[in-house]
Amino acid sequence: MGKEKTHINIVVIGHVDSGKSTTTGHLIYKCGGIDKRTIEKFEKEAQEMGKGSFKYAWVLDKLKAERERGITIDIALWKFETAKFYVTIIDAPGHRDFIKNMITGTSQADCAVLVVACGTGEFEAGISKNGQTREHALLAQTLGVKQMIVACNKMDSTEPPFSEKRFEEIITEVKSFIKKIGYNPATIPFVPISGFNGDNMLEPSANMSWYKGWSVERKEGNASGKTLLEALDCIIPPQRPTDRPLRLPLQDVYKIGGIGTVPVGRVETGVIKPGMVVTFAPQNVTTEVKSVEMHHESLPEAQPGDNVGFNEKNVSVKDIRRGSVCSDSKNDPAKESKSFTAQVIVMNHPGQIGAGYTPVLDCHTAHIACKFAELKEKVDRRTGKKVEDLPKFLKSGDAGIVELIPTKPLCVEAFTDYAPLGRFAVRDMRQTVAVGVIKGVTKDDGSSGKVTKSAQKKK
């Protein structure tokens, strides 16, 4: 074993019939963690079902069905390798919680792969007003997925097949709309592929001799290549934010006999280590960390991405709960958010949203009702420019800047300061009706808080 490869997360987006499953299935099948036995089983079933042409999508359909039924799938199935990376596909749309997962940031994607279908009429349907191509791309941008790869799929079904003219026509159109939502086309590889036949997936295709390859220009270094796999290999790996102040939203708080209170959660930014004096918001409780554990082993320090449990002195289960945020009391400690301003995009609300609307917000691990106190402005969701001041309502498809007031104590942050604590989903009627990114927060100065004895000594 040489040096471990870097882990990166991708999200695969695009219109419903663009071939996301086939393309993803192909990568997992050829470069991934599915063993030969499973593949043979799938192939046999596909043949018996008359899907003899064996679409790679079959692999994904099987996995999805298991995922939907709540069977935990061997997660290796959603991974594949490139020369440089272990790639995890963190979600594929079509999964009902896709949008919620993307926002509450079960994991943050490092790159989005936008799949567009090049068949006659197919591309047009996907990019039309009702298509999902734009919505998914806009979501990725809004939620801070900075890198993108565009896979122009189904090149085998253009007229004539593998048409250079059609490819050029499509990338011109895609470049124009992704530029409008805030991506720079010069940094994006455009790869003509057939996810089904494998053209330009792992090896350059003989069917598209006209294709000279993709190239990107970016400050981290230029890159070029011919295949989708090479494009994935050129993703810029994320900088894990260890240098930021600590933010650790709690997923649970356990009471363990003989040990005491053990909060559990994922470090989003900064580091946590024994001896640190931490403050929990919004409760404003300050105490000392006795020990930090991951997988039952004690750690000298936990970093972003680590799921840890840690032991606290003199804090009861009543003091803190899921949704509380742990921070370093000496370095920009987290505080209760009295109100916050956010840019929201209304996605599928049957009526309209006006001042006074009070749905539940899912932000990091918190799940709290917040009131839309004021609609400040309506903005063009494609350009972000203001189109109207103090609108009466926002309806599906609209974007706006709003002021929100939590109905119970809550701790959130501006997206630019702490991204994982600065994006949220608005849930109502058992679905995601809007998504938002927090622009600014009015914080409580938190003068009245509880400080344990050990924390006072440390001061």
Swiss-Prot record:
Residues 194-196 are annotated as: G5. It is found in: Cytoplasm. Keywords: Cytoplasm, Elongation factor, GTP-binding, Nucleotide-binding, Phosphoprotein, Protein biosynthesis. GO terms for molecular function: GTP binding; GTPase activity; translation elongation factor activity. Residues 70-74 are annotated as: G2. The keyword Phosphoprotein applies. Residues 153-156 are annotated as: G4. The modification 5-glutamyl glycerylphosphorylethanolamine is found at E301, E374. Residues 14-21 are annotated as: G1. Residues 91-94 are annotated as: G3. Residues 5-242 form the tr-type G domain. One of its GO terms (cellular component) is cytoplasm. Gene3D superfamilies: P-loop containing nucleotide triphosphate hydrolases (3.40.50.300), Translation factors (2.40.30.10). Belongs to the TRAFAC class translation factor GTPase superfamily. Classic translation factor GTPase family. EF-Tu/EF-1A subfamily. This protein promotes the GTP-dependent binding of aminoacyl-tRNA to the A-site of ribosomes during protein biosynthesis. PANTHER family: TRANSLATION FACTOR (PTHR23115). This is Elongation factor 1-alpha 4. The lineage of its organism: Eukaryota, Metazoa, Ecdysozoa, Nematoda, Chromadorea. The gene is eft-4.
